[in-house]
Amino acid sequence: MENLNLVSLPHFVSVENLSVEEVEALINRAEYFKNGGATPNLTEPIYITNMFFEDSSRTHTSFEMAERKLGLTVIPFDPAHSSVNKGETLYDTSLIMEAVGVNIEVIRHSQNEYYQNLIRPQNHQHLDIGIINAGDGSGQHPSQCLLDMMTIHEHFKQFKGLKVAIVGDITNSRVAKSNMELLHRLGAEVYFSGPEYWYSKEFDKYGKYEELDKLISEMDVMMLLRVQHERHSDDPNEKNFDAKAYHEKYGINNQRYQELKPNAIIMHPGPINHDVELSANLVESDKCMFTRQMQNGVFMRMAMIEAVLRGRKLGGLK
């Protein structure tokens, strides 16, 4: 049966401003779409563009698939051949997109909270275009967070009391920041592990840091993070990084896999560094949800886009 508790938002930039009820409604809506539920009947053409200023394959492709499944018209945008390379600001690019008729922008950008000047412009009055955050620097990744919540809910049917370990390059991960905050609010017990130099005491309010081998047999969810070498330009630990040593100390190998609880799952936002965060032979193992996460991402992003369509009263939705 179709869920009637539909979320309505003018923009979708963070999970921190979502209520638990809205998160649950988005999960229900995404599951509805996954189970073959009808997409909303749009009464007018809707135009959307994907503006990815950082490399992406999964998120970009997933958003475009979601957009096409909803019946939206996708306007191509290639930063490498745009006026951004001539010094045009993101605000001015967005102003132009609105002027030519684009209704919503999906943006990934290296700057944390790039969206603030687009949704709350201090020196401008005219920009009025929907913004969906596809990742901002090391800040937030709301769509990855919500597809992760959907995947966990699909497997366990609940969040309260689940033990979830977030392991790896936590400080530089926007996925970790979004997930730890929301998992905590949903009632899960959050734990952290990985190199201590990539951990910050500011995360203590969400969970507890432990050595991986002390956690492995107790966790319901092992959430592995990619080592983000591209964000380590000023990090002295980058020069001494040893992939084999990292895998031995912080990766899921065959031995640790055998120690997992029978119903435990392994998650990873991708791309996976084989034999670093996870042994190559375990990527398609029964407990690894990597491809399930990607599959669920399309349906969660459909729910997110629909929420912005409703929030902006586009296509006859409200």
From Swiss-Prot:
Transferase listed as a keyword: yes
Q: Which Gene Ontology cellular component terms are annotated? A: cytosol
Documented EC number(s): 2.1.3.2
User: Which keywords describe this protein according to UniProt?
Assistant: Pyrimidine biosynthesis, Transferase
* Domain of life per record: Bacteria
Q: Which residues form a coiled coil?
A: none
Pfam families for this protein? OTCace (PF00185), OTCace_N (PF02729)
What is an example of a GO molecular function annotated in this UniProt entry?
amino acid binding
Task: Give the multimer and partner information.
Answer: Heterododecamer (2C3:3R2) of six catalytic PyrB chains organized as two trimers (C3), and six regulatory PyrI chains organized as three dimers (R2).
What this protein is reported to do is described as: Catalyzes the condensation of carbamoyl phosphate and aspartate to form carbamoyl aspartate and inorganic phosphate, the committed step in the de novo pyrimidine nucleotide biosynthesis pathway.
Protein name per Swiss-Prot or TrEMBL: Aspartate carbamoyltransferase catalytic subunit
**Per the UniProt entry, what species is this protein from, by scientific name?**
Lactobacillus johnsonii (strain CNCM I-12250 / La1 / NCC 533)
**Gene of origin?**
pyrB
